[in-house]
Amino acid sequence: MKKTNSLYVSSPVNALVKGILREDKTLKEVLEHGDFGLGTFNDLDGEMVLWDGVFYDLHSDGKTNVADINLETPYACVTHFKPETSVIVDEELTFDTLKKKIDSLFLSKNLIYAIQVTGKFKSIKARSVPKQEAYRPLVDVAGDQKEFFFEEEEGTLVGFWTPDFMHSVTVPDYHLHFISDDKQRGGHLLEFLSSKVEIKIQPIEQLNLDLPHSIEYLTAGLDEDISDDLDKAEH
C-alpha cells in the first residue's frame, strides 16, 4: 500500500488572521513533521522557509539567516517533500503563467500540493513584515509590510497549493516563499519573471492539524469567515 503524504499545520490560519501572533510551538517540534514548508515566527518577526530540513528567517529588509531551532511559531505548514512530478520550463514565466503550468499538472483540485520551483529568475518582487505587537489582526499588519525587489537571482520557491474549502485551516490557493541559492535573500512571493526553472510537485492526501492550548486561542472567536481578510493580507 502506498504511504500517504501528510501536511502538518501547527495552528489554524484563522487564529493568525485574528491576531494570535504567539504560540509555544518550537521549530524543533515542527521539524518532527517535515523537512519542507513555510510559515512565520512569533510576533510575525519574519517570513519562514523550511528547505532541506533547515529553517530560514526572511526578514523585513529582504535579508535572511538560519533560524534558531528553539524559536517559536504561531503558524507553520510542513511536509516530508517527496515530489512525484518534475517539469523543466525553459521559457519565461510570470507568477500567473506559472500557476497555469502547475494547474495542468494537478491530479485533482481537491488535494493539497507541495510545490518547489528552482532556477533562474530575472526579477522577484517579495515582501516581509517587521516584528509586531500581539493581538493585531493580520489585515492591519499587512499595511506595515516591506516590499523589495531582486534581479538576476538563482533560487527556489517553496510552498503549497491548497483548495479554497480549507481557507480557515491554511492559506488557500498558491502560497510561496522565495529564498536565494546563497540563502542571503528572500521573502513572501508577490510577483516574478523567470528564465528557466524546474517545477517539482507532490500531491498530499492527509492533513495533520494541531489545535493550540493557549488561553488566547481557547478564548478566541474563530467562527467568522476570514477569507476576505486573509486574501488582503496575503496578496
Features from the language model and the residues they span:
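Short helix/loop capping segments that flank catalytic or ligand/cofactor-binding pockets
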Residues: L58-H59, K125-A126, S168, G186-H188
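Intrinsically disordered, low-complexity terminal/linker regions enriched in Pro/Ser/Gly
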Residues: I20-D24, G46-V49, E205-H235
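A hydrophobic, small-residue-rich beta->alpha segment in the mid-to-C-terminal subdomain
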Residues: S180-L222
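Short beta-strand scaffold segments in enzyme catalytic cores
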Residues: E47-V49, I115, L176
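Histidine-centered divalent-metal-coordination microenvironment in nucleic-acid enzymes
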Residues: V171-I179
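N-terminal low-complexity or amphipathic/hydrophobic leaders
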Residues: P12-A76
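A glycine-rich, hydrophobic loop/mini-helix early in the fold
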Residues: L58-D103
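Long, positively charged binding patches that form subdomain-scale interaction surfaces
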Residues: D96-F160, H167-V169
